[in-house]
Design a protein with these regions (language model features):
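Glycine-rich anion/phosphate-binding loop at the beta-strand->alpha-helix junction
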Residues: 157-164, 179-272
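Catalytic alpha/beta active-site cores
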Residues: 1-189, 264
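Generic, well-ordered alpha-helical scaffold segments in large soluble proteins
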Residues: 13, 17, 164-167, 199-206, ...
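Short hydrophobic/aromatic residue motifs in ordered secondary structure
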Residues: 36-37, 252, 297, 323
Length: 387
């Protein structure tokens, strides 16, 4: 159908339902990402090609526990484990990584970030040790901290590209297929889906600057930012939606952080992992290469995020690059500015957090000034203001 045939019909129907001629102020919702979201789509300006992922099906990653050895094929390791065969391991302990000798039947991935965010430097010795290990992916570019600290989506991706460029300059473009990107997925369902897709676009664009055609390896985990200590059941619902967005967005591996914020139990760890199992085996959303391809809304949002992310990356490079901007405190300040805007929206109720600022609305116990520091990139949960 053409725009002229469908849009007026839709507008007339909505006018009747809303009982007003001026429908767009009601339907258009402001967002801090400054992404234009239309209430009605009939096409997309730039149809996108299928955005591939590295793995054929998404790895469902569980924190290692002996009881899961027979059921789980991909583990998060922070301690040494013996006699596990034909498994996939994501190692997040640099001391442990130093003692691992990969075998052919196993797959090892490093989740160890070689960047020192406080000093604005790369741990060169650690990076070289990891590269010498023979892991399937040796160097982790971690932007989960930035999401949990309150960075905008386009800031997260721009920073990921800027960190990647620093690694290329240090170790050459051949490092691109040795990288794994650790990305935290928040609660803005379609935006987060588009975030992963947009990153595939801009990373591939960066690789082509070096005559390569690389696809990023994405390790997606659930966010801490929208979780609350006293709201466990809602945490569980939120993280399930985040996992779904990650799988549909094309993550190569997913991991569920414990839905209990202040503590961890064997039962909570098991339930957190089984969220992935339900989505994968009942909804079967972990096997599609680009499940949201063809959705006008997601594709348009993907393109907007990609454009904003690339523009920020270019701006950062022109200003000296990621490490230099860290040393100047500019990265920290930009994240801080967006983070406090988000927190203000939480305080005002523009961002709804059920059980925190709505149903019921809790009393504020900490100010924004107490929670955030413009000189430091640190994770802050929205609910901390009320706890």
């Amino acid at each position: 159908m053409s725009d002229t045939a469908t849009l007026p019909t839709w507008e007339n129907l909505v006018k009747k339902q809303l009982k007003t001629e001026d429908i767009y102020p009601i339907l258009e919702k402001e967002n801090l990402e400054r992404i234009e979201v239309r209430p009605f789509y009939t096409d997309v300006q730039k149809p996108l090609a299928n955005l591939p992922k590295v793995e054929e099906s998404t790895h469902l990653v569980a924190k290692y526990h002996e009881s899961l050895e027979d059921e789980v094929f991909a583990f998060m390791l922070d301690q040494n484990v013996e006699n596990l065969d034909e498994k996939t391991f994501f190692v997040n302990n640099k001391d442990l990584a130093g003692h691992i000798s990969p075998r052919e039947e196993d797959q090892y991935f490093s989740l160890i970030d070689v960047f020192n965010e406080k000093e604005g430097s790369i741990d060169d010795q650690l990076a070289k040790e990891l590269l010498a290990k023979g892991f399937k992916r040796s160097i982790c570019v971690d932007i989960s901290l930035h999401q949990n600290a309150g960075a905008a989506i386009y800031q997260q991706l721009g920073i990921a590209l800027a960190k990647t460029k620093e690694l290329i300059e240090a170790y050459g473009p051949e490092i691109l297929n040795k990288l794994i990107f650790k990305i935290a997925v928040g609660g803005n369902y379609f935006f987060e889906m588009a975030k992963l897709r947009a990153f595939k676009m801009v990373f591939n664009q960066l690789s082509k600057e070096y005559n390569l055609d690389e696809v990023p390896y994405i390790f997606a985990e659930t966010s801490f930012r929208n979780k609350a200590i006293s709201d466990n059941e809602n945490n569980l619902i939120r993280s399930t939606l985040e996992l779904a967005a990650a799988m549909i967005g094309g993550a190569d591996a997913v991991y569920t952080n414990n839905y209990l914020v202040s503590r961890s139990t064997d039962n909570s760890e098991e339930i957190s992992f089984k969220q992935q199992i339900v989505l994968a085996y009942e909804s079967i959303i972990n096997v599609f290469e680009d499940a949201s391809n063809g959705s006008y809304y997601v594709e348009d949002t993907t393109q907007q995020i990609a454009d904003k992310s690339w523009a920020l990356f270019v701006e950062m490079e022109d200003a000296g690059g990621y490490l230099e901007l860290l040393k100047q405190g500019i990265v920290q300040k930009k994240i801080y500015e967006h983070a406090i805007q988000e927190q203000q929206w939480i305080e005002e109720g523009k961002i709804k957090l059920i059980g925190v600022n709505l149903y019921p609305k809790l009393d504020i116990k900490k100010s924004i000034e107490e929670l955030y520091n413009e000189k430091e990139i640190k994770a802050v949960r929205w609910a901390e203001m009320f706890e």
